């Protein structure tokens, strides 16, 4: 009987990690019904982070709340309460920016006035509950506000030269003359999950690299926001060159200023959901994501899990929506591309669950063939 750990990331825009894991297991079981499956859907701090913890941690409880979304419209969401542990005797709150201030919550891009107020409101709710620790995923952001909305919801004030609060979002950054942190709520232990290493400002900064995704189109607009983020860094007394400070439109920097610690998303999630223990007696692990390409390197879920599998002596396998020509798949014993199985990317996107099941079946067959081949080779060796 084969023991398979299922640990895909989300297939962004199509299938959540939890659903992907189920579909892969169903496909494998169609070939090997007696196989044993351990579900550990993964995330790297972006979309699906809360769902990964909810699926992996027994006793996790959803805590519903309504927050001001990135456009100021109320959004019904939740944060996740994890049971008490030795390190967190009053429990851990898991919150992701994607479900409170994420770009998927917008009807249209709002580069100047989208902000992170909702994230701050969710953090405040978890603090009110009394948690010992916060785990915050900050992928999929909608704004480049430098985390000012989040900090404002936690009690900070960002003022112009006349002492009046500045406008929300990136629009207000250029007008910030002073920051009042006297009302800022104290931070518990805060771990910030991100796979981004970009600094806050400069050519690799939040505005230059990620601003266009959020609607900042012109060079002049990017320069204005970049200057505003630099000024914010001065007022918060943080180094704008800090790795990861540019994550989520500068929210990474704001969380560090609040007292948080940035951590590689995939590694932190894997540790907190007990993935190493799950792999200790596993034969194989299947991971995956929507697009496995030349950028799917260190820090991304599939590459991280391939290394973890090697350490545990398990076979690493990959199922991806597509696998590009520049992708390095040498860490995986077997690879299944949904696009190749479906015949086109359009067909794969139209029925992702169907083709994930097909990928699971393909991987089961190739694993069985490899095992049979190894047995044959072993039987032929002189005793």
Descriptions of predicted regions:
Residues 1-138, 142-383:
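N-terminal loops that bind phosphate or other acidic moieties
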């Amino acid at each position: 009987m084969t023991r398979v750990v299922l640990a895909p990331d989300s297939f962004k825009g199509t299938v959540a990690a939890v659903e992907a894991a189920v579909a892969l297991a169903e496909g494998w079981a169609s070939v090997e019904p007696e196989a044993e499956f351990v579900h550990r859907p993964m995330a790297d701090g972006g979309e699906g982070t809360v769902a990964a913890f909810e699926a992996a941690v027994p006793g996790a409880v959803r805590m519903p709340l309504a927050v001001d979304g990135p456009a100021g419209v109320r959004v019904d969401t939740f944060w996740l309460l994890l049971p008490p542990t030795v390190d967190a005797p009053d429990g851990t709150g898991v919150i992701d920016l994607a479900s409170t201030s994420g770009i998927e919550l917008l009807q249209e891009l709002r580069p100047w006035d989208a902000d992170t107020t909702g994230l701050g409101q969710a953090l405040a709710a978890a603090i009110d509950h009394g948690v010992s620790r916060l785990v915050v995923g900050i992928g999929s952001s909608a704004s480049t506000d430098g985390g000012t909305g989040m900090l404002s919801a936690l009690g900070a004030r960002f003022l112009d030269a006349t002492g009046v609060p500045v406008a929300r979002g990136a629009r207000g950054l250029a007008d910030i003359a002073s920051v009042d942190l006297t009302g800022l709520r104290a931070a518990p232990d805060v771990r910030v999950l991100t796979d981004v290493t970009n600094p806050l400002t400069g050519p690799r900064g939040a505005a230059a690299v990620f601003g266009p995704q959020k609607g900042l189109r012109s060079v002049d607009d990017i320069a204005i926001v970049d200057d505003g983020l630099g000024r914010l860094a001065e007022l918060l007394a943080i180094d704008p060159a800090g790795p990861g400070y540019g994550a989520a439109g500068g929210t990474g920097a704001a969380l560090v200023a609040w007292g948080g610690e940035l951590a590689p998303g995939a590694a932190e999630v894997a540790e907190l959901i007990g993935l190493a223990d799950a792999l200790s007696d596993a034969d194989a692990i299947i991971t995956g994501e929507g697009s496995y390409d030349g950028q799917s390197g260190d820090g991304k879920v599939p590459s991280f899990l391939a290394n973890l599998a090697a350490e545990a002596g398990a076979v690493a396998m990959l199922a991806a929506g597509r696998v590009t020509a520049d992708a390095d798949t040498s860490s995986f014993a077997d690879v299944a591309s949904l696009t190749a199985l479906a015949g086109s990317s359009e067909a794969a996107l139209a029925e992702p669950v169907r083709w994930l099941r097909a990928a699971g079946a393909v991987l089961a067959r190739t694993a069985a063939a490899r095992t049979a081949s190894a047995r044959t080779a072993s039987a032929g060796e002189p005793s």
